Structures are given as structure tokens and as C-alpha cells.
Design a protein with these regions (language model features):
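Short C-terminal tail/terminal secondary-structure segment
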Residues: 92-95, 146, 222, 233-250
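Substrate-binding pocket helix/loop in short-chain dehydrogenase/reductase
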Residues: 96-98, 105-110, 191, 202
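Active-site helix of classical SDR
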Residues: 121, 157, 165
Length: 250
């Protein structure tokens, strides 16, 4: 157990990948955690792997307001508090030029990547954080900081999430700190198409010589929900293996 033992976190989109890595890091330091995900079977497997004595799961779609309400209600019922929210649930269902982007698909991306994060933030604020404090971490992307060809809807949604982070940080202060993490390519099923069959080539572009893994983001989230970051809010922590260094100057 650590200094944070007894704290409670809600992590969305956490049955696998980055969300699971975040939940794993928080459980390891002594937190109790509620994880969400769309697939009930995958969620149960994740709960069992993380430890059913400290973790509960609530299945549903992140953009569904009824699911948001249920998840927050369940974590309050099970643990009596919700100190931390990590908005990780996201989608990137389309690849192609922005000129041909289906606007209905773009709306779906924004519903999941931005509006759901706002919905969960509102609900955790009213349920606990408004009176008791806490921290929120939004999982954004380097695609929200620099142009990312052929995944425009995803990139624009993550840019919006970064701005939402700043808005929430301003309005929720001083009780609640709100920050974002912007990963580059992390080895998950979600990002598999970006490196499958060419991982060595993809990794060579990174000054640190490898792609990210979920625990890299878990460590960053653990920092941003710890006392070590008590004077940090409204910021975006880029966790990118140094890929932005390649832009150079001039």
C-alpha cells in the first residue's frame, strides 16, 4: 500500500490497452478502481486479472448517458467516493482524406472522444469531486497537437479534448485538477494498424527506439493523479518516445 491507498478511480475504456494499463498502475499503488468497457466478457476478464477484491466493471458505451450515470452510481455505491476520473474511452473508425470524411462518422467520433469525457466529468464532479476534490485525466493524443493525415476526425476530436481539459481545469479549480496525456503510437489492438507487420520500421522513427506500451501511459496517469502533481493543472503531458523531436528547428 502507498500514500494513495484508499483512493478510488473511475477509468473508462479499460478492458484492454491503455485503459487497462492505467487501471493496473492505479491498483498497484493501492487504489480501488471501477473500469468500463463495451464488451461485458472482456470487462469481466480484466476485472479478474486486476483483482476482483479491488476492481469492479460496468459495461456500456461511453457516449451513452445512461451508462455514464450507471457507472458513477455503481462506483459510489461500491466504494463511497470517486477521487479520480481517467477518460480513456475513444474511437477511430475511419481512415482517409478529410475531404471525403463522412460527417455522420465525424459526429460519432466526437460523441465518444469528447462529449463522453465531458459527461463523465460532469457526473463525477457532482457525485463527489465538487465537495471533496480530486483529479481528472483525459487521454488525448499527439494527433490532437499536430496534423495526422488520414485520421482527421480522430485528431480534431483529440484537439477538442485538450481544449476541454483546459476549460474543465479552469472551472473546476481549486478543488479538482484536470490534465491530459497525449501519447504517440502505443502497442495496443486499437493502434495495431499503425505498426502491424512493420513494428521495427515504425519504432526506428522514435528517438527512444521503441513504440509505447500501456504501462507508459499508466505511469503518467498515476503521476497526474498523485500528490506529486498537486500544482499541475490544465496541462497536456506528451508521452511520445521523443517523436516530436524529429520536427527539428528551421
Amino acid at each position: 500500500m502507498t500514500e494513495l491507498s484508499g483512493k478510488v478511480a473511475l477509468v473508462t475504456g479499460a478492458s484492454r490497452g491503455i485503459g487497462y494499463g492505467v487501471a493496473e498502475a492505479l491498483v498497484a499503488r493501492g487504489d480501488r478502481v471501477c473500469i468500463t468497457g463495451r464488451n461485458e466478457d472482456a470487462l469481466k476478464e480484466a476485472v479478474d486479472a486486476l483483482g476482483a477484491d479491488r476492481v469492479i466493471g460496468v459495461a456500456g458505451k461511453a457516449h451513452d448517458e445512461a451508462h455514464q450515470a450507471e457507472a458513477v452510481a455503481r462506483v459510489m455505491e461500491a466504494f463511497g467516493r470517486v477521487d479520480y476520473l481517467v477518460n480513456n474511452a475513444g474511437t477511430n473508425p475511419v481512415f482517409g482524406p478529410i475531404a471525403d470524411l463522412d460527417l455522420n462518422v465525424a459526429r460519432k467520433v466526437f460523441e465518444t472522444n469528447v462529449i463522453s469525457a465531458l459527461g463523465f466529468a460532469q457526473r463525477t464532479w457532482h457525485a463527489w469531486q465538487k465537495d471533496n476534490g480530486g483529479a481528472i485525466v483525459n487521454i488525448a493524443s499527439v494527433a490532437g497537437i499536430a496534423p495526422s493525415p488520414f485520421i482527421a476526425a480522430y485528431g480534431v476530436s483529440k484537439a477538442a479534448l485538450i481544449n476541454l481539459t483546459q476549460q474543465l481545469a479552469h472551472e473546476f479549480a481549486p478543488k479538482v485538477r484536470v490534465n491530459a496525456i497525449a501519447p504517440a503510437v502505443v502497442k495496443t489492438k486499437f493502434a495495431q494498424a499503425l505498426y502491424e507487420g512493420r513494428e521495427e520500421e515504425a519504432a526506428a522513427a522514435y528517438p527512444l527506439g521503441r513504440l509505447g506500451v500501456p504501462s507508459d501511459i499508466g505511469g503518467a496517469a498515476a503521476f497526474l493523479t498523485s500528490g506529486q502533481s498537486d500544482w499541475v493543472t490544465g496541462q497536456t503531458l506528451v508521452v511520445d518516445g521523443g517523436i516530436f523531436l524529429n520536427a527539428g528547428v528551421g
